Amino acid sequence: MLAKRIIPCLDVKDGQVVKGVQFRNHEIIGDIVPLAQRYAQEGADELVFYDITASSDGRVVDKSWVSRVAEVIDIPFCVAGGIKSPEDASQILSFGADKISINSPALADPTLISRLADRFGVQCIVVGIDTWFEAETGKYHVNQYTGDESRTRVTEWETLDWVKEVQKRGAGEIVLNMMNQDGVRNGYDLEQLRLVREVCKVPLIASGGAGTMEHFLEAFRDVDVDGALAASVFHKQIINIGDLKRFLSEQGVEIRLC
């Protein structure tokens, strides 16, 4: 059995790490490189960096900090932000990233997924899915351009259909960003995760809602996700990654201990 992964998420805006609630009202957390170093030292299995306004601004992620991060950490990391072509991806990978993640650009042009997978291999192509539960309809829908609340829009894609589509096109991993739970710290949306797990045959990463160690345990034990991504509990030092991994190991979760 592959070890489960603990993945801190660093949302980047204007060169600094920020964090919002339900993808809004972002506050500055700190500088990118020191935070990356801290999480690597605490025992993170990998890191994810989202340049949250790159797609909505029509630009590619700022590559200068990508190379600085690669110089100071020795764990895998994934970068997302405005990647619209194999050339964009090639540059980011050449600066030291191990994986690239696409989200809004894939919704704008789904062929991008297969073009990237064909060139670089599915192992380094992650698709992020920003999913929102509409209480009125009882449905989960995919959102686009979520880094800029003035441009965020609901797409025609229902979440489960998009999960199936991106796998068909070559996604090697899916990060499910559950927007209703983002930054609230009241637990992952286990019901949605179960629905997605049934149709997701590639590694599935849960994102949005972690507030306690038990929340991570529930995602691994009850849904069998492959990794759990979180931000605010790590940024605000509510949970220490080393302590979390020891807790999970004691509960029988296969995890890499520091």
From Swiss-Prot:
A Pfam family this chain is assigned to: His_biosynth
Family membership: Belongs to the HisA/HisF family.
GO (cellular component) term, any one: cytoplasm
Catalytic-site annotation from UniProt: D11, D130
GO MF entry, a single one: imidazoleglycerol-phosphate synthase activity
Origin species: Serratia proteamaculans (strain 568)
EC identifiers of the protein: 4.3.2.10
Pathway: Amino-acid biosynthesis; L-histidine biosynthesis; L-histidine from 5-phospho-alpha-D-ribose 1-diphosphate: step 5/9
InterPro entries per the UniProt record, alphabetical: Aldolase_TIM (IPR013785), His_biosynth (IPR006062), HisF (IPR004651), IGPS_HisA/HisF (IPR050064), RibuloseP-bd_barrel (IPR011060)
Keywords recorded for this protein, A-Z: Amino-acid biosynthesis, Cytoplasm, Histidine biosynthesis, Lyase
Catalytic activities: 5-[(5-phospho-1-deoxy-D-ribulos-1-ylimino)methylamino]-1-(5-phospho-beta-D-ribosyl)imidazole-4-carboxamide + L-glutamine = D-erythro-1-(imidazol-4-yl)glycerol 3-phosphate + 5-amino-1-(5-phospho-beta-D-ribosyl)imidazole-4-carboxamide + L-glutamate + H(+)
Domain of life, per lineage: Bacteria
Main subcellular location: cytoplasm
GO biological process per UniProt: L-histidine biosynthetic process
Protein name (record): Imidazole glycerol phosphate synthase subunit HisF
Subunit note: Heterodimer of HisH and HisF.
The protein's role, per its UniProt record: IGPS catalyzes the conversion of PRFAR and glutamine to IGP, AICAR and glutamate. The HisF subunit catalyzes the cyclization activity that produces IGP and AICAR from PRFAR using the ammonia provided by the HisH subunit.
Subcellular location as annotated: Cytoplasm
